[in-house]
């Protein structure tokens, strides 16, 4: 069935110049980045507090030392390279087929692969800002530092540009994502279980008839998809 599905997806991609991709953690797991919700993902690794608690706005405010210990260890403590999925998406954009990548990931791997139009719903670990004066710090500044990072210009606290639990998504990014999805001919959703809202609700804005779900395991929305291809997204995209 997967082979048949891949052939149909290949045909849709060949025929379209208005593809939008919406992806989650599964897109980056083949690059060695742990998925929050999989059995061996972040939420199942032992720490003093549950990951959901540590990655919350309240915890960041109240226990910044513990937050940054976890953040350095689990979110930026490794070098990752783009995989087949990232590279293929960048190629489709270059070929004039793909209009945008909408991602729930915070790792910057789409840009590293060459994608230009990337809407990051949950921000990026590559960007960090002083909360007082707005000075920018890149990920190496945070990775190589110790304890709670402070701004070398004004002494203010430095915060990663990622959306923590209890924080709202950037409304401008969200609105732009909705527009791309509304206007898409082919909407490919990959590497997400479609359980995190409001991001998961974005697919309701799609009005076409080529909704494709690519995921290792079944999702809550398989029933409404026009095509479901089950498997690792990098492997599948490598065949397209």
Where does each model-flagged region fall?
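Conserved catalytic core of sirtuin-type NAD+-dependent deacylases
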Residues: 1-240
